[in-house]
From Swiss-Prot:
Glycans are attached at residues 48, 67, 97. It is found in: Secreted; Secreted, Cell wall. Keywords: Cell wall, Disulfide bond, Glycoprotein, Secreted, Signal. Self-assembles to form functional amyloid fibrils called rodlets. Self-assembly into fibrillar rodlets occurs spontaneously at hydrophobic:hydrophilic interfaces and the rodlets further associate laterally to form amphipathic monolayers. The keyword Manganese does not apply. Belongs to the fungal hydrophobin family. This is Class I hydrophobin 1. Residues 1-17 form the signal peptide. It comes from Passalora fulva (Tomato leaf mold). Aerial growth, conidiation, and dispersal of filamentous fungi in the environment rely upon a capability of their secreting small amphipathic proteins called hydrophobins (HPBs) with low sequence identity. Class I can self-assemble into an outermost layer of rodlet bundles on aerial cell surfaces, conferring cellular hydrophobicity that supports fungal growth, development and dispersal; whereas Class II form highly ordered films at water-air interfaces through intermolecular interactions but contribute nothing to the rodlet structure. Disulfide bonds join 36-85, 44-78, 45-63, 86-100. Abundant on conidia and aerial structures formed in vitro and emerging from disease lesions on infected tomato plants.
Length: 105
């Protein structure tokens, strides 16, 4: 009986252990939220200069690559429908003439 009580107490202690959040401020691609593929970054296209379609946001808009994460897009820091996974160079700049994939939240 005592062993069962101890086992139940130990299992509940392990199950209720608090998980610490890792700092992903320097993570990119698949490391940042597990949403984008390796070599891609989450970007937020905040303006639309060539119509109301998605390509207008990516090709003609202002896409921010820094300080954008899936969590910020879900917290309405990035307007709905304007969060994309865009391929990036090793220096973190956005590649020209490549397709960005919309992230659906």
């Amino acid at each position: 009986m005592q062993f069962t009580s101890f086992a139940i107490l130990a299992i509940s202690a392990v199950a209720s252990a608090r998980v610490t959040r890792r700092d992903d401020s320097s993570a990119t691609g698949a490391d940042k939220g597990g949403t984008c593929a390796v070599g891609s970054q989450i970007s937020c296209c905040t303006t639309n200069s060539s119509g109301s379609d998605i390509l207008g946001n990516v090709l003609g808009g202002s896409c921010l690559l820094d300080n954008v994460s899936l969590i910020s897009s879900l917290n309405s820091n990035c307007p709905a429908g304007n969060t994309f996974c865009c391929p990036s160079n090793q220096d973190g700049t956005l590649n020209i003439n490549v397709s960005c994939i919309p992230v659906s939240a």
